[in-house]
Amino acid sequence: MSNNKGQLLQDPFLNTLRREHVPVSIYLVNGIKLQGQIESFDQYVVLLRNTVTQMVYKHAISTIVPGRAVSFATGESEESPAS
């Protein structure tokens, strides 16, 4: 997957979580679970706010789980399934 394709998915998802102040659980590759709200992000890091703001490097993140369902647009047109 090219970096551009990754950004097409990451940016709208993270931006929706940030804009709507959705509580998230972030699981790191070492198994640690962090909780809070996404304050900001860029190509390499996510700022996660709880009682303090933590800078979490994206390469250390395994999974981001929103506290509620969110919908976001990727800007790509989805192909309809063949009948």
Swiss-Prot record:
Domain Sm as annotated: residue spans: 11-70
Gene Ontology cellular component list: cytosol
Function (record text): RNA chaperone that binds small regulatory RNA (sRNAs) and mRNAs to facilitate mRNA translational regulation in response to envelope stress, environmental stress and changes in metabolite concentrations. Also binds with high specificity to tRNAs.
Assembly notes: Homohexamer.
Gene Ontology biological process: regulation of DNA-templated transcription; regulation of RNA stability; regulation of translation, ncRNA-mediated
Record key words, sorted: RNA-binding, Stress response
InterPro entries named among the record's database cross-references: Hfq (IPR005001), LSM_dom_sf (IPR010920), Sm (IPR047575)
Pfam families in the record: Hfq
Record-linked CDD domains: Hfq
HAMAP family: Hfq (MF_00436)
Protein name per the record: RNA-binding protein Hfq
Top-rank taxon: Bacteria
